């Protein structure tokens, strides 16, 4: 059997079938042609109406857009007006400073152009184009430039000639010094060898007081075991100062150093001079000197009295600087005060380094000093022919130089008579010698000859000291720097150490006596310590990369390339007698280097601080000017190099200090937490009868508050333990007594914890908020409480009666007799009711306080 499925396909326009609620289909309605035409017309009309509505909507939208744009324009105009009004209300000083800064920058650019270009035709201020010059003007301008350059070249040539003359003068002077040193070395070595055999006999036979100075080549003045060094050699003895072969230095008794015109050459006391002593009798204590012992008198103040010392150790550093150590300072505090140093010459004339006693030496021309020195040299008993003044000057054919020289010679001839009268005055000769050596050293430093020449001299003297290292002095101090000038270069600072009578003391003032120690200097007068050892060597300290300004405890140091400036402050520290007594038992043999021993507990006064800051600002300005002159181009295009680098304390190159950053960060954190916590504490003060007290904390980034209740608002029998609130950066701690503690970072949790502490105290001690003078307590709550109390009083009281026969109950209320001993008032229910209501009021009050803190 075949299975088929037939599917009927409906026509394209099937009739609309209508059915009723039962699903029965209505017969289809056939539409006539006229009705169909009317239906089509209605559809077309409806379509037109829809299009018209769309057009109207579009027009309305366009109108609305135009209105919105106009409104936006009006709002924009109002905004611009408001902005203009706000700009007009801005402080005019801001724009003034901006214009001022722009003007300053433009002025610096103009200064740079003027300084760097120097040609007016290349500076165009008003326009980019420039009218060409006429040929005649160009010719005149070129001619003017050529003449100006020729004049500049002539000036440079004249300066070079003058500089060459001075350099030749300096070189000749230095060579003269060197020749004298060589002659002295040769003479002392030969004479030491010749007199070796005679030394013991002479030393044993000589005794008595000091004798007079000997002549050239002969036996000098005889002291206690001391003989002049003219022809026999130095003998260490009682200190008779003999004539030194015409050079007049004299023996330093007990030390063995022979001062030759201020240069400590060293006596022949070792293998050559040891046999000279014999049993002639050396005074006790004189054999303690060694090659590094320096005769210098210094002292310090202790309990108002001045204590003198005489020993100082001399040593040389790796860079050639001199270190002078004072071993007998009893305590470190004595360095805080000025260490007074008294330099003595061989005639016991003392020169103090006190600032009040320092006087500026008169400026005398170099030729005058040279001739005066030569004149005094002629008066001394010198074996060698003295050097004439002309030997230190180069031969030149310059007429101007000859005229100047003739004028100086005429002036010298007029002054020589006055000088001859005072030629035997040791103080005058010593002063002239100091000036002469200072002038020569300044010339050497000016042309930077000092390091090379004096380094050779130091090596030669060191060889002398090593060859005769047994009991001879290493040399005098290199120089004393007083107020910036080198005074007394090469001077012997020994003095009369040994006893006995002194003999003739002659002086050598020739400028050809060299300085055997150049690098180390004393800085006397301006320093806070009184004697700071400073190495003034431009070739060693050259640093042109940056400027360093160092503020130490005692002074300000400025290093700007080869420009080194030291400014000291004399601090006045109050002396503690207890500390002095405790420190007197310290080891007196400890070497105290003045270079590094500065007190770390110096407290400057406001006046001293202001003075230091004023000096620092002044120097900063000067260094800025130096930088501006030195590198205009670099300063103009690299603004970070305008200000010098400032380093306080020590010389380091660290961009940021971690300790400072950490401290600033901790302080900022603490301030943030402090402000948040203080808002909560203000709410407590406003709503509760508390007393808030702030106490200083141990650290900088911490605070401590103590919160207590006012006495009138608490139970005096059981007072509340104070609440301590400590803030350390962003950490908050609350402590009450020994058992209650809290630690968190949130101030709201902090407030809730403190409220719980206060609430528990109020509940435990039965304190109602109405009893406190609290602003936050509601008066309606108090009225409700009064109504509750009245209702309690109006309730009939219930009593317990006992079966005691003595009790009588009567119906009449007026005649009731109650035995109070047997009737108890049943008040437990009433007390519990009042207490529960009071607790409810306390809970309600503190709940409102917590809400206020949460919504702060």
Swiss-Prot record:
Coiled-coil annotated spans: 41-91
Annotated GO CC locations: core mediator complex; mediator complex; membrane
GO molecular function: transcription coregulator activity
Biased composition (Basic and acidic residues): 67-79
UniProt KW Transmembrane helix keyword: yes
InterPro entries: Mediator_Med17 (IPR019313)
Ranges that cross the membrane: 217-237, 251-271
GO terms, biological process: regulation of transcription by RNA polymerase II
Main location group: membrane
Membrane-related topology note: Multi-pass membrane protein
Region (Disordered): 55-79, 371-424
Domain of life: Eukaryota
Comp. bias regions, Low complexity: 371-399, 406-420
Localisation per UniProt entry: Membrane; Nucleus
Keywords, ordered alphabetically: Activator, Coiled coil, Membrane, Nucleus, Transcription, Transcription regulation, Transmembrane, Transmembrane helix
Quaternary structure and partners: Component of the Mediator complex.
Family membership noted in the UniProt record: Belongs to the Mediator complex subunit 17 family.
Summary of the function given for this chain in its UniProt record: Component of the Mediator complex, a coactivator involved in the regulated transcription of nearly all RNA polymerase II-dependent genes. Mediator functions as a bridge to convey information from gene-specific regulatory proteins to the basal RNA polymerase II transcription machinery. Mediator is recruited to promoters by direct interactions with regulatory proteins and serves as a scaffold for the assembly of a functional preinitiation complex with RNA polymerase II and the general transcription factors.
Record's protein name: Putative mediator of RNA polymerase II transcription subunit 17
Native source species: Dictyostelium discoideum
Native organism taxonomy: Eukaryota, Amoebozoa, Evosea, Eumycetozoa, Dictyostelia
Recorded name of the encoding gene: med17
